[in-house]
Structures are given as structure tokens and as C-alpha cells.
Amino acid sequence: MRVLLHLPALLASLILLQAAASTTRAQTTRTSAISDTVSQAKVQVNKAFLDSRTRLKTAMSSETPTSRQLSEYLKHAKGRTRTAIRNGQVWEESLKRLRQKASLTNVTDPSLDLTSLSLEVGCGAPAPVVRCDPCSPYRTITGDCNNRRKPALGAANRALARWLPAEYEDGLSLPFGWTPGKTRNGFPLPLAREVSNKIVGYLNEEGVLDQNRSLLFMQWGQIVDHDLDFAPDTELGSSEYSKAQCDEYCIQGDNCFPIMFPPNDPKAGTQGKCMPFFRAGFVCPTPPYKSLAREQINALTSFLDASFVYSSEPSLASRLRNLSSPLGLMAVNQEVSDHGLPYLPYDSKKPSPCEFINTTARVPCFLAGDSRASEHILLATSHTLFLREHNRLARELKRLNPQWDGEKLYQEARKILGAFVQIITFRDYLPILLGDHMQKWIPPYQGYSESVDPRISNVFTFAFRFGHLEVPSSMFRLDENYQPWGPEPELPLHTLFFNTWRMVKDGGIDPLVRGLLAKKSKLMKQNKMMTGELRNKLFQPTHRIHGFDLAAINTQRCRDHGQPGYNSWRAFCDLSQPQTLEELNTVLKSKMLAKKLLGLYGTPDNIDIWIGAIAEPLVERGRVGPLLACLLGKQFQQIRDGDRFWWENPGVFTNEQKDSLQKMSFSRLVCDNTRITKVPRDPFWANSYPYDFVDCSAIDKLDLSPWASVKN
């Protein structure tokens, strides 16, 4: 009788035990399914990465690389960036396979167990890749540990920040324009190349130069951009065939999103049906997995820290140093010099695309903190100046502090050079970029706040591409009297991509630096946006007659990144959102441009953010429109206020050191690191020689005496 009384409880316990066992079996089955699926995905993705590396090596050995192969050389992921992108691709491929299995077998969707999936892939929650020393006076190379509360905030190889949610065709990863016939807000999207042809292109180069901004103004923008963001491409497919499908046959699929040519496009006659386009690298989503939409990677630190000099990758940062010397120096070229002054070291990895630009000279690409250093000769020139300045600072600090070891000298010189980039950007560059909107978006510095998010936003990577419209069609080299230098003083822009030989074998950097100081940038004009040198001849090899279209690439990249449209960003910035032709005309102050845009897009809501932003008229005394002023200003304010090592933050430098730092200038950088003796006082403004130039003796020097150790 007593047993019967306890029978219900026993039965209930038995049921619970059976349920628990069933749950455990289901969990084990699910975990096993995830493990098997991830293993299969890893095999596929790893093969794609291996194939890509082999393919690139073979292409560079051919001595006749194509535009695509030159671009791939620049956008090829390395080191920890490569690992992060590989994990992102494995995660997305695994999730796709698991969802397919779930729908086929009608079982509970295993993708709900996203934590297990992330751990199996190797993602995990973002954590610092270095041990944080809260008392260290120096930044880490990776950007970790800047924010003590969230040590990974702003670090390299994390997702770009979203200020507005991503907008993909399928809500997850497919870009708008992917599926033929599918509309956005009721209208089909125009081809990216068609937008470039009808909105961005122009024929006549007359009257395009900016009468108030020097060529250095354009070049500084590129330097800053390469300090802040870089998203290498994904790896495509797992076979040579899939690569050929994208590269040669324009077959869309996987991470291939070719830029198709519209009917009667002049490029169609020489380049076939399309320009190949590979989608940007992305990372695993992070807990709590509120969104599974694809998030593109930023391979660099988000901080304005001169990472283009020192790298955001620890292994490369070490490789860039001269560790055989106790002076804290950066490594320099051991094979050639610029009239006794150092060049960047050559990249020892062979083969090098720069060698094939001139197969007689065969000058390799340079090795620098940013992989894009040899992309263009003026960029390589800028990198060279910063390399020399680091070594100059390190030697001078050693003279003041003989007891300092190489590590201390390296870190102190790096810290000063980082402050230099911050000061020039905020004191000299941004005020004449943002004009009257500077104070609105970047108020005076009030100190560091760990609650400010310093991460580079996804939209900023498009906003900062306004600089592509400031690039003129040719570059000039000038002699000591700022007159044309040598038999070829003017060089078409497209001949200077990967062109290291022009520097090493044909005059050094001084003639190029003088061109930066005395020649003008191109002016952003609504009817003359981007020079044909970039719109038709980007990365055009010397042995070929065609190149890429940078405007079409920028437009396609907006869609690849899932960028919301023009009006979404206007609303974000508290600006009006035009809906009609009249309203768009009011914003753009150009009925012709408004008509063209509506004819292509159907609605202002669909205008790609890069196109809409560059179409706006310039703000007073600035060089961008209101929307760009908002996006750029907001980003730079966050970069500054969310950086614990910002040069003005109390405790980073002493008051005496800060007083010295404020005397730094780009003109002094030139005086100290070239043979140039005459420079302008305001090098970002358009200057005429000799009226606006002074002797280097009239330019303030950086006084390093406040860095002298008390012990000395």
C-alpha cells in the first residue's frame, strides 16, 4: 500500500529522467551535427584560402598581372586578419548548411545554438589578443586595452560599427542588386557602372583644380584613411573554376558580385561583360547575436595612432623594426638610398607587382605598416617621410637620454609621431575640410570618456571616399626652384600605380614632395566629379589598355556592405529627406543632377550613400557637403574623445611636452627629412612659389628637451 502511495512520485521522477536523457541525446546530436557541419565548411573555406594564395603567387610570377590581380595583391588578407576573415566565412557557410539541414529534416533549427557554433568555428567572444597592462604609457600595436572597461573596443580585426542597421536583400548577407528583377522600395537599382557613367564621369579636364587647396590636402586625407580602416576581400570559392567564373565569365555567386557593363559601354569592347568584384571580408557575429547580418572587418586599429607606419599586426610591427640596433629605429632599405637619405625597405616576398611596371628597372614594392604603401607613388612618398621622421626622433631622444634602451626609444618616438598625426589632422586638415560645420560636429576637446565608442563606423568607410574626387589627372615633379623637373615632369595618374621605380631610379622623393606642396588638388564639382584616370584606368597595367572604375567599385561596395540609402543617412544627421524632384533640387541646388539621379534610382531613398553624399554642394569654407560634414565630423569626434591615449588627454604628455608638440607642422617634417629648403607655412592651402614659401629656418622646430629624463 505504501509503495502504491509513492508510485505517482516515482513515475514523475522517471518521466523527468527520461526527458532529461532525451534532451541530452538531442543536445549531443545537435552538437555532433554542428561539429560535422563546421568541419565540412572548414575544408571548403581553407581550400579557398590556399587556392587564393597559390593563384596570386602564380599571377605575380607571370610578369603580366591584370588590374584584378594588382587589386587582389592590395586587398589580400594576411596574419590575424586572414584568420578573422576565414572564421567569418566558415561561420556563415556552416550556418547556411545547418539551416538547409533543418528545413530538410524538419528538426529544431540548430542555428539557435549560436554559442556552440561560434566555439566550434573558433570565433568566441571578442577578447584582447594581448595581456593588458593598465599602467602602460604606450598603446598596444593591435589597439587592444585602450578602453579599460571594454579592452577590445577599437582594436584591429573587429567588425566595423553600425550607426544604422544593415540593409541586405535577404536581411542577412545578400546585397541589393543581387537578385535580377528584385526591387528596393519599389524600384530596381541601377547598375553601378551606369551610375558612374551618368553621374560621376566627365571628359574635359579644364577648370577642375582647386584654387585654394594644395595637392597635399588630398594626400593627407588618404594618409589618415589608411590609418583608420581597411577591409580586405573575402576569398572566393574553392577551385580555379569558380575563380574563372567570376574573373572571366562574370558569373555571380558565392562572394563574387561582378560589376556589369550597361549596353554600349565603351569598356565592353575591351573588357568583356563586366569588371570582377569580390565582396569585402567579414567577421563572425558576436554575442548576444541580436543580428546575424554580415558585418565587414576593420583590419586596422580605429585610433588615429600612425598605424600606417607601425602596423596593427604584431608580427609585421616587429618585422618593420631594426631590432639589431639599440636605438629604437625602424628598418630601412639596405640596397638603395635617396642621395644618402633612407627609403622604406623592400618587401622581401616575391614576386612583387611593382617589378613588372618597369621590367628593366625591376624595383620591388616597399614594406610599410600598411600593405597599400606602394599602391601609388605619392602614398609611398608619404610613408618614406614618416619612416625618416621616426628614426630622426629616436636618434634625438637617444642623444637626450643615453640610458634609454631600444624599446623605450621606439615607443617614445612612436608616441610622438602618433601625436603628430592627430595634431595635423585636427588643427590643420579638418577645419578646412569641414569649414563652417567644424565647431558643430567637433567641439573643443573636453577630455577622454570611456563611454565614447571610438570604433570606425561602416558608413565612414564610404564617407571618407570623398577624397577620390580630389585626385587630379596627373602629378608633377618640381626642382629646387619649383620649376618642372627632368624630361618628364608631368606624369599621368594611371602610370603611377605600383610605380616604385620612378622614385628609386628617377629622382627620389624631393621632386614629388615639392609637387605636393606647390600643385593643387582637384575640386569636387557636381558636373566634374572623378577624373577618368580613376574612373577608367585604376590599376591599369602598362601592357594593357584598360583598368578599373573606382566610382563603380565604390557604388557596388555600398551595396556589398548593406549600407542604408541616402535618405536614411540624411535622417540620421537630422537633415531633410527629399522625396520629389523639387525637394531633391532644393538639397542639391542642381535640377539637372537631381533629374539624373531620380532617372536612375526612381526615389532618393535608394540613392547609394557614397553617390548621394558626394552630390551635395559644399558647405561654406569647406570641401564636403552637409551630409558628409555630419558623418565625418561625428566619426572624428568619437575617435578623439574615445581614445585614452589622445595627445591632449591629461597624463599622456606633460604640459611642457604638449607645448612642444603644438609647434609640429608638415612643413617642418619636410625640412627635417628631405633636402628641400623652401616650404610654405600653410602647406594644405594652395601656395605659389616664391611668394608663399619661406626658408626652413623660419619654420618652428620640435623642441625635444621636455623629453629629457630627470635622471639624465
Swiss-Prot record:
Keywords: Antimicrobial, Calcium, Cytoplasm, Disulfide bond, Glycoprotein, Heme, Hydrogen peroxide, Iron, Metal-binding, Nitration, Oxidoreductase, Peroxidase, Phosphoprotein, Secreted, Signal. It is found in: Secreted; Cytoplasm. Ca(2+) binds at residues 227, 301, 303, 305, 307. Residues 27-80 form a propeptide. Its main location: secreted. GO terms for cellular component: basolateral plasma membrane; cytoplasm; extracellular exosome; extracellular region; extracellular space. Glycans are attached at residues 106, 212, 322, 358. Heme-containing oxidoreductase which catalyzes the conversion of thiocyanate (SCN(-)) into antimicrobial agent hypothiocyanous acid (OSCN(-)) in the presence of hydrogen peroxide (H2O2). Also involved in the conversion of iodide (I(-)) into hypoiodite (IO(-)) in the presence of H2O2. Responsible for the inactivation of a wide range of micro-organisms and hence, important component of defense mechanism. Shows antibacterial properties against Pseudomonas aeruginosa. Mammary gland, milk and salivary gland. Found in bronchial submucosal glands. The lineage of its organism: Eukaryota, Metazoa, Chordata, Craniata, Vertebrata. Disulfide bonds join 132-145, 246-256, 250-274, 354-365, 573-630, 671-696. It catalyses: 2 a phenolic donor + H2O2 = 2 a phenolic radical donor + 2 H2O; thiocyanate + H2O2 + H(+) = hypothiocyanous acid + H2O; iodide + H2O2 = hypoiodite + H2O. Its EC number is 1.11.1.7. GO terms for molecular function: heme binding; lactoperoxidase activity; metal ion binding; thiocyanate peroxidase activity. This is Lactoperoxidase. The modification 3'-nitrotyrosine is found at residue 482. The keyword Glycoprotein applies. It comes from the Eukaryota. Residues 1-26 form the signal peptide.
